[in-house]
Swiss-Prot record:
Record organism: Bacillus subtilis (strain 168)
Protein name: Polyribonucleotide nucleotidyltransferase
InterPro entries in the cross-refs: ExoRNase_PH_dom1, ExoRNase_PH_dom2, ExoRNase_PH_dom2_sf, KH_dom, KH_dom_type_1, KH_dom_type_1_sf, NA-bd_OB-fold, PNPase
Function of the molecule: Involved in mRNA degradation. Catalyzes the phosphorolysis of single-stranded polyribonucleotides processively in the 3'- to 5'-direction. Necessary for competence development in Bacillus subtilis. May be necessary for modification of the srfA transcript (stabilization or translation activation). Involved in processing precursor type I toxin-antitoxin RNAs antitoxin SR4 and SR5 RNAs to their mature forms.
Enzyme class per UniProt: transferase
PROSITE patterns, per the entry: KH_TYPE_1, S1
EC numbers: 2.7.7.8
CC per GO annotation: cytosol
Length: 705
């Protein structure tokens, strides 16, 4: 590949996609600048020259956000980008998943794929540009890669599918689907949907694949024009003679160990066989490389036997049928001082979710490359080491935790009531207490129960299930409710969440090159059957959301004022609103349209704050009577507060029917007197009269007599 710049263009969903090579980052194995509309992403691929002594493929995919891409300077003291945002982590995972299966078995060279987002047009997805660029950077490089792949976003408005919808279109769409794959098959799906039937989700996936084929053909043209010749890289291979020797020693005992039904007992039985074989080779004083190979052969034997049993004999490690779900149980209200809690157990997978309700001021503020500035619904997922019976450091959430939390959030968001109907911020935290596969889906089930226990009026309960696949040649078996071993040794992890009516979230990862429409269809239908079974079990525990919120949850009172009066409530430099908060102990959130949300665990505090605000924004009406309090006395009259924050002057001549020599002869500070508004002058000053009230009372008495 020469040093000169090459430019290639294609139309992508009504916007121009431009690829530039040969100018930037020329020392990387492969580099491309992707311009999609005004979005610009630099994608690079680099590989180590020598393989690493590892038993896995060391691939790293990074999606790097730069705030200059949207004309922002980072906040804080340091003024530079810090740790990746949640969106960047999710985008990195999104790109990694379709690329990873397309490297040869035994490839051990370290590969790093980096996409730097340099300019963002909100209507031209930087994630899709980065996925395209990552595939192309690998394809034009000398790194052995069995791609290319491409990905698209699919939306649906008025029953019509749309490729790469704009921000406005996505708001109207009932599907937000990212699908990726090769020209032959789909190998990654990530979707959120508003209770959309399985058949429509499948059609959306296949619709996206047609566009993917076109993008891959475009990549192949570029590779033919500027691609480097692929390097000859030595793949890790097992010694065949050693393989046969280990197989003869271990195969029979491993077959028995694999079929032990209980997880820990099975792991112990498998490890016992492995340790005995390794010890035999160590006694024969083989070198370290040979011992390492023996361990890898043993792991491969376990994998092959598990897969053979499932595909040929339809026998799963724990003895279940292929479409059988593990025993289910659930419970609510475990934690008395929280706003809502739900425990969901499926076999040896267990999640405890806690729901916390907050004021609208508790929303999460987002400062990234997107248009969204805040969100009022959050789902966080924690996976401590004790859940698998192990020790380990307690760190912040990693990519996996962030990804699983986001999947749960996507699954539950369509059933969260609107801000108008339920003016609360909702935070869910899922604590995984036991893990044997499908913890993300258990957290969705537990979170649904926690919200129902908290009294959140969700539109419908949501359940999730993980489907698996074992494929051997043309033969395949779809598994319902996969456990940890089936996830690790199988070909697919297909998570489906939804309500009785339809799908709310999909996530599919595979370890083979792709899946056909037939397999996807079977997996979706089998998942629906399993989801209904789980929903019925959950509803037996709690059939609907509680009618009352927890007494520990904040009570929110909503009122509306004239938007022009917002400044009166806030006061100069926030002085007035802070005074109300201090006096009443409430939280106050004000919308631009004049809607005010007052929240507190004490209802009397809410009412007190409401009364103060009503007084602040009340309009003084000429001719109206008010019971006011004397606040200040001057020689010329008394200043009377007719309601909070509003004073008027009763001139000395308007204090009584008779002539008054001294104001103090009639009123003193603190007296409550009934006054009438006689005038509001051009400067907004209010003139009051006590005389007018007394005159009216006298006339009324005379009429009655």
């Amino acid at each position: 590949m020469g040093q000169e710049k090459h430019v290639f263009t294609i139309d992508w969903a009504g916007r121009t996609l431009t690829v530039e090579t040969g100018q930037l980052a020329k020392q990387a194995n492969g580099a491309v600048m992707i311009r999609y509309g005004d979005t610009a992403v630099l994608s690079t691929a680099t590989a180590s020259k020598e393989p690493k002594p590892l038993d896995f493929f060391p691939l790293t995919v990074n999606y790097e956000e730069r705030l200059y891409a949207v004309g922002k300077i980072p906040g804080g003291f340091i003024k530079r980008e810090g740790r990746p945002s949640e969106k960047a982590v999710l985008a990195s995972r999104l790109i990694d998943r379709p690329i990873r299966p397309l490297f040869a078995d035994g490839f051990r060279n370290e590969v790093q794929v980096i996409s730097i987002v340099m300019s963002v047009d909100q209507n031209c997805s930087s994630e899709m540009a980065a996925m395209f660029g990552s595939s192309l950077a690998l394809s034009v490089s000398d790194i052995p890669f069995e791609g290319p792949i491409a990905g698209v976003t699919v939306g649906r408005i008025d029953d019509q599918f749309i490729i790469n919808p704009t921000v406005d279109q996505l708001e109207k769409s009932d599907i937000n689907l990212v699908v990726a794959g090769t020209k032959d098959a789909i190998n990654m799906v990530e979707a959120g949907a508003d209770e959309v039937p399985e058949e429509i989700m499948l059609e959306a996936i296949m619709f996206g694949h047609e566009e993917i084929k076109r993008l891959i053909a475009f990549q192949e043209e570029i590779v033919a024009a500027v691609g480097k010749e692929k390097s000859e890289i030595k793949l890790f291979e097992i010694d065949e003679e050693l393989n046969e020797k280990v197989k003869a020693l271990a195969e029979e005992d491993l077959l028995k160990a694999i079929q032990v039904h209980e997880k820990h007992a099975r792991e112990d039985a498998i490890n016992e066989v492995k340790n005995a074989v390794v010890a035999k080779f160590e006694d024969e004083e083989h070198d370290e490389d040979t011992i390492k190979q023996v361990k890898q052969i043993l792991s491969k034997l376990v994998k092959n036997e598990v897969r053979r049993l499932i595909t040929e004999e339809k026998v799963r490690p724990d003895g279940r049928g292929v479409d059988q779900i593990r025993p289910l149980s659930s419970e609510v209200g475990l934690l008395p001082r929280t706003h809502g809690s739900g425990l969901f157990t499926r076999g040896q997978t267990q999640a405890l979710s806690v729901c916390t309700l907050g004021a609208l001021g508790d929303v999460q503020i987002l400062d990234g490359l997107g248009v969204e500035e805040s969100k009022r619904f959050m789902h966080h997922y924690n996976f401590p080491q004790f859940s698998v019976g192990e020790t380990g450091p307690m760190r912040g959430p990693g990519r996996r935790e962030i990804g699983h939390g986001a999947l749960g959030e996507r699954a539950l968001e369509p059933v969260i009531p609107s801000e108008k109907d339920f003016p609360y911020t909702v935070r869910l935290v899922s604590e995984v207490l036991e893990s044997n596969g499908s913890t993300s889906q258990a957290s969705i089930c537990a979170s649904t129960l926690a919200m129902m226990d908290a009294g959140v009026p969700i539109k419908a309960p949501v359940a999730g299930i993980a489907m698996g696949l074992v494929k051997s040649g043309e033969h395949y078996t779809v598994l319902t409710d996969i456990q940890g071993m089936e996830d690790a040794l199988g070909d697919m992890d297909f998570k489906v969440a939804g309500t009785e009516k339809g799908v709310t979230a999909l996530q599919m990862d595979i370890k083979i090159e792709g899946l056909s429409r037939e397999i996807l269809e079977e997996a979706l239908q089998q998942a629906k059957k399993g989801r209904m079974e789980i929903l019925n079990s959950m509803l037996a525990t709690l059939s609907e959301s509680r009618k009352e919120l927890s007494r520990y949850a904040p009570k929110i009172l909503t009122m509306t004022i004239n938007p022009d009066k917002i400044r009166d409530v806030i006061g100069p430099s926030g002085k007035q609103i802070n005074k109300i908060i201090e006096e009443t102990g409430v939280k106050i959130d004000i919308e631009q349209d004049g809607t005010i949300f007052i929240s507190s665990t004490d209802e009397s505090g809410n009412q007190k704050a409401k009364k103060i605000i009503e007084d602040l924004v009340r309009e003084v009406e000429v001719g109206q009577l008010y019971l006011g309090k004397v606040k200040r006395i001057e020689k010329f009259g008394a200043f009377v507060e007719i309601f909070s924050g509003k004073d008027g002057l009763v001139h000395i001549s308007e204090l009584a029917l008779e002539r008054v020599g001294k104001v103090e002869d009639v009123v003193k500070i603190g007296d409550e007197i009934l006054v009438k508004v006689t005038e509001i002058d051009k400067q907004g000053r209010v003139n009051l009269s006590r005389k007018a009230v007394l005159r009216e009372e006298k006339e009324k008495e005379e009429q009655q007599s």
